[in-house]
Amino acid sequence: MHAFLVILFMIVIGALIGGITNIIAIKMLFHPQRAYHIGKWRIPFTPGLVPKRREEIAYKIGNVIEEHLITESLIKEKISSLSAREAIESFITQQIQKLKKDNATLQNFAGYFGIDLAKTAEDKLSNLIDEKLAQYYQDHNQEPLKSLIPSELEVELDEKIEALTPLLCDRARIYLSSAKGEQDIYNMLDTFFAEKGKIIGLLQMFMTKENIAERIQMELIRLTNHPKAREIVAQLINNEYMTLKNKSLGGVVSPEQFNNIKEKFTPLILSYADISARVNQPIKDLAPSIVKYAEQHAATWTTNLIVEKAAEHLSSIMKQVNLSGIVEEQINSFDLDYIERLIIEIANKELKLIMLLGFLLGGIIGCLQGIIALFV
């Protein structure tokens, strides 16, 4: 009986020593949180392991996460996976459908950035037109018009000029043959007689004004059909046309005239462009073909582009993000009590097993000591 009590006592003492030692060891991982000194001598094991090595632990954890857990190759693999592609493509498709349903406009997108798209676009377009016109005038104002006219347009103008003589003569004949033409000739003849007085009155002794007007009308009509008259008209028109083509742009349009033209031309272009109406028009109505194409191809194309560009620039992105640095900084910012709670929550079961193992090993060692003590 005495031997049994001795062994039991040694088991209890050993278990208590082993268990309490492990409990203290676990506590010493986190406590004390600062160093204690006796004079200049620092008490051993202060601060605890975690407070003392927190920066080193944070650095190591950050490196482990970046080099072994969230690696560049792993992220590339996940981004390129079928599930990731399907998720991205599904999201893009949903957004396109949402744009159609919500009647989204270009101004809606610009509004997210605080931009008045209509005013901005009009200002940009107005400045661009003014700059281009001014630059064109400055570069070409000494050049002849014929060098500035496109060859196709020049050919067409030449054809129009050639057709101008018959047209003018035919119109003149029609006018002279009309009642208005006849009346205008009579009125001019009446004015002419009134100005010339008695000398012209002698003609009226042989012919009446009506006869004279009729003869003049007939001669003018005959003149419009005469080949020589038409040749003279054609030559005059062609001479003026060639003179105009050989003039410089600056000789035809002065700087003041150009500025006046520009001031009227730019607002005219802007009014035809009607930018305000276009940027506030639903995109599905503004560019239905683009929306249709986007529905059919944009999701797949954009997904491929996102995956390719993400993989291409992932290395530089990860360097700029500095994942290990973020983890290290975050861990260093945690309160020590929070780190203790976090570790205990994660390893609670294992820590309890360690404490139980301490009691068990202590008990076994105590039992062995008790047995040895009986035989010594």
UniProtKB/Swiss-Prot annotation:
GO terms for cellular component: plasma membrane. The chain crosses the membrane at residues 4-24, 356-376. Pfam families: DUF445. It is a multi-pass membrane protein. It is found in: Cell membrane. Keywords: Cell membrane, Membrane, Transmembrane, Transmembrane helix. The keyword Membrane applies. InterPro entries: DUF445 (IPR007383), UCP032178 (IPR016991). Belongs to the UPF0754 family. This is UPF0754 membrane protein Sca_1420.
